[in-house]
Regions:
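Short, Gly/Pro- and small/polar-rich lid/capping loops
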Residues: 1-57, 67
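Conserved beta-strand/loop scaffold segments within soluble protein domains that form the structured core
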Residues: 34-37, 44-200
Length: 200
């Protein structure tokens, strides 16, 4: 079992709600394990019985700790940007031996101005032995602004012995530029499955 904190919920505006419906294909809800980053700030947060999300003290971002008791559980960590600027976030996932979890991430940009909006998400996964992890990342941009809508994801995956990691990424539409970097290190008998869709 992991240490839990009291959940923080907020009322979201319509733009944020609409973007979340696109980037979170499982359906974002302010319940269970979740963390919504909006314009560079974590605005709502919750832990589950077996998943704890802790704000980093040295870098912008969070540590997500997933207990071995987590079985067929989900954690949702979307990012929405509706204001111009650069947002860089470092998220680290620590998955204990034997855990079974789906991690739903991704970023949506709503741009109405002439300035650039850019999100760089650096995600690192530390997966123990005999675990099953599915990571779903959707990218999307919308709005009538002329400013660039840029998403640059970096994914580092370290998979322990006999574990399975499934990586599903989709660039839905509206993104002007993207640079994706992926690094993978597999332990003995570990497996990696990758599905990448570019729809823009």
């Amino acid at each position: 079992m992991v240490s839990r904190k009291e959940a923080i919920t907020v009322k979201l505006n319509q733009v944020t709600e609409d973007v979340l419906k696109v980037i979170d294909s499982y359906g974002f809800k302010q319940e269970g394990a979740y963390n919504l980053r909006l314009n560079g700030m974590a605005v709502c947060h919750g832990d589950s019985r077996h998943i704890a999300i802790v704000k980093k003290t040295d870098l912008p971002g969070i540590d997500i700790r997933i207990s071995s008791e987590a079985q067929n559980e989900q954690v949702h960590i979307p990012v929405v940007m509706s204001e111009p600027g650069l947002d860089v976030v470092y998220n680290d996932f620590y998955v204990e031996d034997g855990a079974d979890v789906t991690i739903v991430a991704g970023c949506g940009i709503h741009g109405e101005g002439c300035s650039e909006t850019r999100h760089d998400g650096i995600h690192t996964f530390h997966v123990g032995k005999n675990a099953n992890v599915k990571y779903v990342e959707n990218h999307y941009a919308e709005g009538n602004g002329t400013g660039g809508k840029i998403l640059n994801p970096v994914t580092k995956i370290y998979v322990g012995e006999n574990s399975v990691f499934t990586l599903e990424t989709t660039q839905i539409k509206g993104v002007d530029s993207t640079k994706r970097e992926t690094f993978v290190e597999l332990g003995p008998n570990a497996k990696l499955y990758v599905t990448e869709k570019l729809m823009t």
